[in-house]
Amino acid sequence: MRIVSLFLSFLFVLSSFVSVQAQELTLEDIYKTRKYGQRGVASMRWMKDNISYSTLEMNREVGARDIVRYDVKSGQRSVLVPASNLMHEGEPVQIHDYIWSEDNTKMLVYTNSQRVWRDNTRGDYWLLDLQTGEFRQLGQGLDPSRMMFAKFSPAADKVAYVYYNNIYVEDLSTGERTQLTFDGSDEIINGNFDWVYEEELGIQDGFRWSPDGKSIAYWHSDTRGTGVFYMINNVDSIYSSVIPFPYPKAGTQNSAVKV
C-alpha cells in the first residue's frame, strides 16, 4: 500500500512538472504585454455620496482610460467619463491621474507627466466640467509638462499650481492667471521640495489652500547653503551631460525651509 501511495505521489509531481513545462515563457509576455503585470485599482477616489468610488479603467477601443464609478454595496459599475469625451486634436488625452473638486462637479485631469526625482510630479492639467461638458487645458501659453500639484480652491472657482518653482492661481471663469511668488529659481523653491525632502521625508507637494479659499500656505526652500552634487547623464543623448542638484551629505547643511 505504501509503495502504491509513493507511486501516485510521484505521478502527481511529474504531471505538475509537465504542466508547468508546457507553459511557454516568452520575452514578449514579460516585457511587452500585461500578462504578468501587477493587478490593482488605478487612482481610486472616494466620492462625495459616501457610497461609491471612482477609478481608471482602460478603454481598448479608444486606447485611453475611462473614469468609472463603482457602488461599494451593489458593485454596480457606471462610466462617469468615457475616454472618447477627453479628446484633443482628434487624439485621446492619456490620463496619468485626476483630482475631483469637493462637490464632484469638476475634475482636473493630469497628463503628459514627467519625472522629477523619483516620481512623475510635473505635467499638464486639463479642466473637465461634468455639468457643462467643457474640457480645456489650463495654463495656456505655459511651457508643456511644467505644472505641478494643481488643486482646486474649496469653492472650485480657482486652481492653484506650481510652475518653475513659483505658485500661480488661475481663475476658472475668466482664465486670468495671477502669480503669487516671484523668487522661484533653481535655488529657491516654492510649493514643492528639493531632492532630500522627497527622498528622506517622502514629501513632494508643498502648498495648501485655506478653508475659505482666500489664502495659500506654502513651503519655501532655500538650497543655497547646500552642497551641489554633479550627476553624469549618459542615457538621454549620444553625448553625456552634467546635472547639478543640491545634495546634502551626512553632517552638512540641508536646505533652509519656512512656511
Question: What annotation goes with each model-predicted range?
Answer:
Residues 1-6:
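Positively charged n-region of N-terminal signal peptides that target proteins for export
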Residues 7-16:
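Bacterial N-terminal signal peptides
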Residues 22-259:
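Beta-propeller folds
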